[in-house]
From Swiss-Prot:
Outcome of mutating P38A: 3.9-fold decrease in ability to inhibit rASIC1a channel
Domain of life assignment: Eukaryota
Effect annotated for changing V32A: 17.9-fold decrease in ability to inhibit rASIC1a channel, probably due to structural perturbations
Record protein name field: Psalmotoxin-1
GO cellular component, one term: extracellular region
Molecular functions per Gene Ontology: ion channel regulator activity; toxin activity
Length: 40
């Protein structure tokens, strides 16, 4: 199964984002795969 590219929805598929991406809940919106932010 293909991974989910950047800015595409990942609702109910939190583990399916492509490498380097993470599922993020946008405010007043749905969950999308976004580039992982460095944890500082």
């Amino acid at each position: 199964e293909d991974c989910i590219p950047k800015w595409k929805g990942c609702v109910n598929r939190h583990g399916d984002c492509c490498e380097g991406l993470e599922c993020w809940k946008r405010r007043r919106s749905f969950e999308v795969c976004v580039p992982k932010t460095p944890k500082t």
